Amino acid sequence: MTTLFSKIKEVTELAAVSGHEAPVRAYLREKLTPHVDEVVTDGLGGIFGIKHSEAADAPRVLVASHMDEVGFMVSEIKPDGTFRVVEIGGWNPMVVSSQRFKLLTRDGHEIPVISGSVPPHLTRGKGGPTMPAIADIVFDGGFADKAEAESFGIRPGDTIVPDSSAILTANEKNIISKAWDNRYGVLMVSELAEALSGQKLGNELYLGSNVQEEVGLRGAHTSTTKFDPEVFLAVDCSPAGDVYGGQGKIGDGTLIRFYDPGHLLLPGMKDFLLTTAEEAGIKYQYYCGKGGTDAGAAHLKNGGVPSTTIGVCARYIHSHQTLYAMDDFLAAQAFLQALVKKLDRSTVDLIKNY
C-alpha cells in the first residue's frame, strides 16, 4: 500500500483545473508512452495511448478518465488587491471560505492565496451569519492594492486550485486529499497501460484522459468523435453517501453505476459488467448517481455508443479534503483489466445485440 499511496499522492497534488490540464497531460504522456504503440492528443488537449490489435475484426474500445479538477478562475482584481472569482466545476459554498489555495499565473508562478470569510463579530446586529454566494467570496493574497497584485503577474483568467496535500488516515486504509475526482481515473488508466504492456488484446484499445469534464463533459465529445469507439468506458469518482445514509460506501468496492440523470446502463452492458465481476471475484456495489460522467456525453455520439462508468466513491468530493479507500481503487483496477481483456468482437456484438 505504501507504493500505491505514493502514486496517489503524486497524481492528486498536480494542479490542473478544467481547460488548464497541462501538468496532468505531461504526467500521462510519460506514463503511457512506454506501454502503448502510439500516443495522440485530440483538439482540446485530451491525451490517449493506442494499443493496436492483430485481430482483423477488432472492435474499437475507448477507456477514458478526465484530467481536470474543480477550482476557480480570477474574474476581477479589485482596487484593494483582492480578487473576485468564478467557479470552475461545482462547489458547495459552505466549503469554500477560509481555505488555502494556489493561484497559477500565466508564466507558471504559484501565488499563495486564501478565501476570505466574515468573522462572527462583523455579523452581530445584522441577523447573524448567512450562506455566502461564491461570487461574493473574496480571495486574498495579502497584496496592498491592484498594482502590487499585478506586479506579481496576476491577471484575470488565472486559475486557482486547492492547496492540499495527500495524507494517510490513522488505520492506513484510506487517504485524504484533494482532486480524487478525477485523479483516480488518471491513475487508473496509467496503471491499466502498465498492466497490459506487451499483451495482445482482442480489441483496438484507446486509453487515456479527457479534458473539461467538470464544466460539461466537453472532452468526451471530442475524443469519441475522433476515435469512433464501439464501446466507451468512463473512469470516474462519485460521491459517497455512506455517512449521510445514502448509497456509496467507501471500502465496499467498485461501483455498478446503473443510473444517473444523463445515462442509463443498457441491459447488455449491465450483464457484461455483472458477469465479469462475478467471474473475477471483484467486490462491487450498486450505485444510483445524482451527477454525471463522460459516459453521459459519449453514449450519444456517432449513432450511439454503449457506455458505462468504472468508478469508486469518495467522501466530501469537490473540496480540499476528500476521503477514500485504497482497497476500492484496487478492486476497480482489477475490474477494469478484466473487462478490457474480454472485449473482443463477439463480446461487443453481444452487448449490442438489441
Please give the residue ranges for each predicted region.
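N-terminal hydrophobic/helix-forming segments and targeting peptides
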Residues: 1-354
